[in-house]
């Protein structure tokens, strides 16, 4: 996902209505999303990018959101942050940050929340950083945006502390460098430093390690792991890399055609997935122990057109279980709550109960 470098500072797009949000009592959840739906309208077509998504996150929880390209992962992140641009719009739903529905905030109120209580780390740090400003000035800008009374000298000191916190050596000196003078991994560390500058309750990381080599990827994940514990931050990690999810996350949401089709703990999804799509995704991951079994399997067919969704289950035309089952093509599955050896799971599949008891991977 490539966005302008100053996206976290800009005003949100106008919403249909902007009543003052009612402040709720502090919730046990850092973030609760209820029935969130987002569409993109293009002439006669309406693309349903996010469809009735709900989930909860406690402080320090790490949720991995996985799925094929076009499944709605980045649209979900932008919807939560209030950064959907026309022709897109959030149709409805609640986004409760510490019990406060930020979906009802005005533009000005949302700008005060974004970057302070909820923050974003992008896939490409060069898109997130202004190439003509020093690293120090950009971190200072992020700090004083939410603490305008802070003296510039104190903000610069805080910027150096943040660079040290993300393991950048010679922090004081590196404040005066420009983004092109940093390596890719160090730029990603700077992006993380800016995101945590105001101790957000929730951090959304959209493919933060995709452009990094394996060693740097491991270092960045270790850094995020440490920051989660220090700041008690809940993290939504959006990625194609199932190995990263396995190493870093507590829970996994498998997204397909704009919906969460399976949500559970990491152990369950990786060791014994219930939804056929989750199982198919895992079988596409290279496994040295299965090299002798033949070519790497691929999921047959293509994801559905989100402007012309099929009736019934969206995965049915590609599903090895439901492809020939009339019910799967005619009736959309409801969420099933199933018990697994590693905890509860929520699965949108007509065969969820039967499949939850089977060993598949």
Predicted segments, located by residue:
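P-loop NTP-binding/switch modules centered on Walker-like glycine-rich loops
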Residues: 68, 82, 108, 204-208, ...
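Conserved ABC transporter NBD signature motif
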Residues: 90-101
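Conserved ABC ATPase signature
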Residues: 177-182, 186
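A short, proline-enriched helix->beta-strand linker immediately N-terminal to the Walker B motif
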Residues: 197-201
């Amino acid at each position: 996902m490539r966005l302008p470098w100053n996206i976290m500072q800009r005003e949100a797009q106008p919403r249909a209505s902007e009543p003052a949000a009612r402040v709720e009592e502090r919730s046990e959840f850092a973030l609760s999303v209820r029935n969130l739906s987002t569409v993109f309208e293009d002439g006669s077509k309406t693309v349903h990018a996010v469809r009735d998504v709900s989930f909860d996150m406690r402080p320090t929880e790490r949720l991995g959101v996985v799925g094929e390209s076009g499944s709605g992962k980045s649209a979900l992140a932008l919807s939560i942050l209030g950064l959907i641009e026309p022709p897109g719009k959030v149709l409805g739903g609640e986004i409760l940050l510490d019990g406060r529905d930020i979906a009802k905030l005005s533009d000005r109120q949302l700008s005060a929340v974004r970057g302070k209580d909820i923050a974003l780390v992008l896939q490409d740090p060069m898109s997130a950083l202004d190439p003509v400003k020093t690293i120090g000035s950009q971190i200072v800008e992020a700090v004083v945006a939410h603490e305008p009374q802070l003296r510039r000298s104190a903000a610069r000191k805080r910027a150096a502390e943040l660079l040290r916190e993300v393991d950048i050596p010679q922090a004081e000196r590196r404040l005066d460098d420009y983004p092109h003078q940093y390596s890719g991994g160090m730029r990603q560390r700077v992006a993380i430093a800016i995101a945590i500058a105001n101790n957000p309750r929730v951090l959304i990381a959209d493919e933060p390690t995709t452009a990094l080599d394996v060693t740097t990827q491991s270092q960045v994940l270790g850094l995020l792991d440490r920051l989660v514990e220090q700041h008690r931050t809940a993290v939504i990690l959006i990625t194609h890399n199932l190995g990263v999810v396995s190493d870093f996350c507590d829970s996994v949401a498998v997204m397909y055609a704009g919906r969460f089709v399976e949500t559970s703990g990491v152990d369950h999804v990786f060791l014994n997935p219930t939804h056929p799509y989750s199982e198919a995704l895992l079988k596409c991951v290279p496994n040295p122990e299965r090299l002798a079994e033949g070519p790497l399997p691929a999921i047959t067919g293509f994801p559905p057109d989100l402007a012309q969704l099929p009736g019934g289950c969206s995965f049915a035309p590609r599903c090895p279980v439901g492809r020939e089952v009339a019910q799967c093509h005619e009736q959309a599955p409801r969420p099933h709550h199933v018990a697994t050896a590693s905890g509860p799971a929520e699965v949108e599949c007509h065969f969820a109960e039967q499949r939850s008891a089977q060993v598949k991977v």
